[in-house]
């Protein structure tokens, strides 16, 4: 199914889309304590089913504060190197803005990840984002360099990389402010080149291949005094009413 999770990002809304198995044949059961997965080796088939999920909105998060984390930590005590449990713990810490702990669990998940895991793309993008938010720019850039060949068609990857590069410029990493700014610009331009992709390809956040990347580029051009280019970007990739 196409699961569309709703988030709040500052004053705007965001929709993350994921391909998740939620329509099960008779006899198949879920396993796991949180974010359960079907216990089956049967092939997955995409069906035209869209599920809207509001569990990550603030009012829902406040109701279940700490619940998922307690359950996941109990499971982690039994399987400390399990990639999926560490991934889900990373997500929980990230949503609660504890980026240092999120990075610790994402790092273990990356080390233990099995080939062709369905959440590999999301894990990579989230880990990259959290490294940037934790101020670990050099580690983030090293991760991006290692992972880039896999995600050449992912606007989410390049959108997030652009944010890390901008943070590196703000932090004056290695004294190369202009270098990091130009690379951030190139990353967001790459998002527009790729465009929006089908959620079934990797999953990801709507707008990172269009209006969100264009917004970041427009802000950058405005700061540089390139007002005509900024306006052109906003006109070519208008922000939808639902995200403004």
Features from the language model and the residues they span:
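Catalytic-site signature of metal-activated, phosphate-bearing donor transferases
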Residues: 1-104
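Residue at a conserved register position within TPR or TPR-like alpha-solenoid repeats
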Residues: 93, 127, 131, 165-168, ...
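Start-of-helix register in tetratricopeptide repeats
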Residues: 84, 118-122, 155-156, 205-207, ...
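TPR-repeat structural position
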Residues: 65, 99-100, 137, 171-174, ...
């Amino acid at each position: 199914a196409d699961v569309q999770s709703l988030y709040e990002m500052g004053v705007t809304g965001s929709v993350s889309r994921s391909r998740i198995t939620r329509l099960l044949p008779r006899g198949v059961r879920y396993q796991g304590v949180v974010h359960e997965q079907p216990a089956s080796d049967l092939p997955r088939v995409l069906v035209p089913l869209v599920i809207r999920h509001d569990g990550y909105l603030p009012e829902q998060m406040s109701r279940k504060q700490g619940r998922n984390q307690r359950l996941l930590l109990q499971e982690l005590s039994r399987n400390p190197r399990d990639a999926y449990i560490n991934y889900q713990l990373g997500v929980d810490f990230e949503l609660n803005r504890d980026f240092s702990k999120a990075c610790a669990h994402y790092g273990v998940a990356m080390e233990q990840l099995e080939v062709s895991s369905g959440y590999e793309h999301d894990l990579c993008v989230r880990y990259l984002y959290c490294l940037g938010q934790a101020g670990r720019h050099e580690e983030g850039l090293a991760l991006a360099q290692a992972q880039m060949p896999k995600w050449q068609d992912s606007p989410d990857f390049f959108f997030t990389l652009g944010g890390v590069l901008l943070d590196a410029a703000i932090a004056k990493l290695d004294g190369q402010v202009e270098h990091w700014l130009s690379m951030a610009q190139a990353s967001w331009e790459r998002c527009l080149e790729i465009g929006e992709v089908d959620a079934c390809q990797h999953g990801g956040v709507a707008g990172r291949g269009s209006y969100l990347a264009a917004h970041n580029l427009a802000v950058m051009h405005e700061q540089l005094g390139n007002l005509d280019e900024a306006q052109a970007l906003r006109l070519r990739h208008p922000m939808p009413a639902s995200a403004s």
